[in-house]
């Protein structure tokens, strides 16, 4: 839990590492006058977290309510929403505790605050890892549904999906605990960066392959109906735009955070890197924005889920 400036101590002391002058030997003016620090107000942090929290709670509630949505695909979507919910909730909790401590409204011993911070860090880190894993799992599920359509229901069964979900959660908690314990080791940070890049490559390869198959299918239909080529080109451009948006949002929201981790290893004392470190809160805000966008991309496009969501909202009133 931070007490130095406005930087949050997410993931152990990770974000305080760049600002800890004694450890890095950086003078306050070493970053230079050109350094741009984007300040994220606590109110904005809480607002983004609240929007994400409400969105993802609604997704989980809708999937839990409708038995027609109890399928492997929606199982992964539900777990993605739960991961995003935990990301937002843990950041909101940390921000609230920080504000209470700074205002003197919450009195606690340093040891208690440290333990609370460690718990929040583990929850945040494990939910981030699981969120990335479930994004990959959704991509794999969609890939199988397209390229192995006839065998899909025998390959992707609900018990298998549940085992995958359990494995992801266990692995996420285990590795996040190790990460918090050994956050100051370069190898640990590099492993996280490699994991992010692996998920990015996996999603890019699968979705590009799916787009290529969809374009071939559209071209075949166009030839059967003797349509002109521009119609097929229009479909390809639309699909490429959708793919660019999907992968672009993923990279834009997650990339800066993992760039932060990479620079901690490569250039912890360089003035330029130190300038980037000052925007850690911005990188966290982008991840929370991703938690807001995920339901719009993966959940709310489903007509069945939207119908169930209306029922949930009507019942709540």
UniProtKB/Swiss-Prot annotation:
CDD domains: 7tmA_MC1R. It is a multi-pass membrane protein. Residues 1-37, 94-118, 184-191, 267-279 are extracellular. One of its GO terms (molecular function) is melanocyte-stimulating hormone receptor activity. The chain crosses the membrane at residues 38-63, 73-93, 119-140, 164-183, 192-211, 241-266, 280-300. Glycans are attached at residue 29. Its main location: membrane. Keywords: Cell membrane, G-protein coupled receptor, Glycoprotein, Lipoprotein, Membrane, Palmitate, Receptor, Transducer, Transmembrane, Transmembrane helix. Residues 64-72, 141-163, 212-240, 301-317 are cytoplasmic. It comes from the Eukaryota. Pfam families: 7tm_1 (PF00001). A lipid is attached at residue 315 (S-palmitoyl cysteine). The keyword Translocase does not apply. One of its GO terms (biological process) is adenylate cyclase-activating G protein-coupled receptor signaling pathway. InterPro entries: GPCR_Rhodpsn, GPCR_Rhodpsn_7TM, Melcrt_ACTH_rcpt, MSH_rcpt. It is found in: Cell membrane. One of its GO terms (cellular component) is plasma membrane. Receptor for MSH (alpha, beta and gamma) and ACTH. The activity of this receptor is mediated by G proteins which activate adenylate cyclase. Mediates melanogenesis, the production of eumelanin (black/brown) and phaeomelanin (red/yellow), via regulation of cAMP signaling in melanocytes. Interacts with MGRN1, but does not undergo MGRN1-mediated ubiquitination; this interaction competes with GNAS-binding and thus inhibits agonist-induced cAMP production. Interacts with OPN3; the interaction results in a decrease in MC1R-mediated cAMP signaling and ultimately a decrease in melanin production in melanocytes. PANTHER family: G-PROTEIN COUPLED RECEPTOR. Belongs to the G-protein coupled receptor 1 family. This is Melanocyte-stimulating hormone receptor. It comes from Colobus guereza (Mantled guereza).
């Amino acid at each position: 839990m931070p007490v130095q400036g406005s930087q949050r101590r997410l993931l152990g002391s990770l974000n305080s590492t760049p600002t800890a002058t004694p450890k890095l030997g950086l003078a306050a003016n070493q970053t230079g006058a050109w350094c741009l620090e984007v300040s994220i107000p606590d109110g904005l942090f809480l607002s983004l977290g609240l929007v994400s929290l409400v969105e993802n709670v609604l997704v989980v509630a809708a999937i839990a309510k409708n038995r027609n949505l109890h399928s492997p695909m929606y199982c992964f979507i539900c777990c993605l929403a739960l991961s995003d919910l935990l990301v937002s909730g843990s950041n909101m909790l940390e921000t609230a505790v920080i504000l209470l401590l700074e205002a003197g409204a919450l009195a606690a011993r340093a040891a208690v605050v440290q333990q609370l911070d460690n718990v929040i860090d583990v929850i945040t880190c494990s939910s981030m890892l699981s969120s990335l894993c479930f994004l990959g799992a959704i991509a794999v599920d969609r890939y199988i549904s397209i390229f192995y359509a006839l065998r899909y229901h025998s390959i992707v069964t609900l018990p298998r999906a549940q085992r995958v979900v359990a494995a992801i959660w266990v692995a996420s908690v285990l590795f996040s605990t190790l990460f918090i314990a050994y956050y100051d080791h370069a190898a640990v940070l590099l492993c996280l960066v490699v994991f992010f890049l692996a998920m990015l490559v996996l999603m890019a390869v699968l979705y590009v392959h799916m787009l290529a198959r969809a374009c071939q299918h559209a071209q075949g239909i166009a030839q059967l109906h003797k349509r002109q080529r521009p119609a097929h080109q229009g479909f390809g451009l639309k699909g490429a735009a959708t793919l660019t948006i999907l992968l672009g949002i993923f990279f834009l929201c997650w990339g800066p955070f993992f760039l932060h981790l990479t620079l901690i290893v490569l250039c912890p004392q360089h003035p330029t890197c130190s300038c980037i470190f000052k925007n850690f809160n911005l990188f966290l805000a982008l991840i929370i924005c991703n938690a807001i966008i995920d339901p719009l991309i993966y959940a709310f496009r489903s007509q069945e889920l939207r119908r169930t969501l209306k029922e949930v909202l009507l019942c709540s009133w």
